[in-house]
Amino acid sequence: MIKLISDNDVFEVLKLMNKSTEQNNYSFERNESKWISFLLNAIQEQNKNNPHYLIIGDYIDNKLKGFLLANSFVGHYNNNVIMDVKDCIIDIDNQNAYTVIRLYNYMMDHIRKHGGKRWRADSIRAHEDTLKYAKLLQLKYNADLYYSAHGTIGE
């Protein structure tokens, strides 16, 4: 069952994010307090019925299997509103593709309901996992694949 993440779901979300971070050994610089602040702000905005924020969870037997955190921005090329997936975190001990699709289906309905048409999802996963994730979205939602580069300037 997909449901909106509420004030009382925060601890479950934090546990799943921490589990995902530990299991995947992401190579980005992590600042938990910044991410938690972003999450809490997004939940507050969603609680105000701000359609530019969406935080949803996929629950099976009242257990969080995955969550999606997204907010929108206005594209500087064409002034279109784009829903930007910030996090799609899945419990890797479960059916990943099934949960991803359920979360994205809900997001697509949310975008349509509020008059939107565009979305995007970047990934910080390792190359192989990023490609699988992107190809799933391409297959299911006819998404275009783009490439990006992330770098660090040395001292």
Write out the residue ranges for each language-model feature.
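Conserved beta-strand-loop-alpha-helix junction that forms the acyl-donor binding cleft
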Residues: 119-132
